[in-house]
């Protein structure tokens, strides 16, 4: 419950002026369990306006811009120029950047509408590294088959990780001690966890 409450607060802080927070939280008061989940989902969808999949390119120029004006890529340290370095095709790391669904879009049917274009969990990333991640769940890697700039893919450690078609409302698949996962760079694990939690709260069902 603490994690859910903390996550709700983090989501609210990103989209809601401080003076409006009491009103924003009003429907969450006194709720727990499924009723709290439903109320959070309603709140996160209220007033939401989709940018569209193509609109993400423009939005990234504001949401994911480094202090030097370059693209902020959480999968690599490559230096990208907005627009000029958009993918396109790629064969190696640092060829171009694309739009990464931190919650893989195949988990909700492959659509680029609805959750498929929600910038809360989409970020610009290296096209090659994104391709290597594929639609594997995030997790801790025990033995890497691929790594670049601290991001890696490989066998999961002995923990249970939820994957599968979660957003569509299914239970998903459980990986415990085996299977392939993708581990983001350490400094961005919190960012991706926040994107996961926010995306799942908003679109599950």
Where are these regions (language model features)?
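Classical eukaryotic N-terminal signal peptides for Sec-dependent ER targeting/secretion
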Residues: 1-6
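Domain-level detector of nuclease and nuclease-like folds
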Residues: 88-205
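N-terminal module-boundary/linker segments of secreted carbohydrate-active enzymes
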Residues: 9-81
């Amino acid at each position: 419950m603490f994690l859910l409450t903390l996550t709700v607060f983090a989501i609210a802080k990103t989209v809601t002026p401080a003076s409006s927070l009491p009103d924003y939280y009003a429907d969450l008061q006194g709720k727990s369990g499924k009723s709290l989940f439903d109320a959070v989902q309603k709140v996160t969808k209220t007033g939401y306006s989709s940018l569209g999949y193509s609109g993400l390119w423009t939005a990234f120029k504001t949401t994911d811009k480094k202090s030097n004006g370059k693209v902020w890529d959480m999968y690599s340290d490559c230096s990208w120029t907005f627009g000029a370095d958009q993918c396109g095709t790629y064969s190696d790391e640092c060829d171009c950047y694309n739009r990464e669904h931190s919650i893989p879009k195949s988990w909700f049917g492959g659509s680029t509408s609805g959750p498929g274009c929600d910038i809360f969990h989409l970020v610009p990333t290296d096209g090659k590294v994104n391709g290597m991640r594929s639609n594997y769940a995030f997790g801790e890697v025990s033995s890497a088959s691929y790594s670049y700039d601290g991001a890696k893919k490989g066998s999961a450690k002995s923990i249970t990780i939820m994957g599968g078609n979660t957003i569509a409302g299914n239970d998903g698949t459980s990986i415990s001690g085996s299977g392939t996962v993708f581990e983001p760079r350490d400094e961005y694990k919190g960012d991706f966890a926040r994107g996961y939690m926010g995306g799942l709260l908003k679109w599950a069902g």
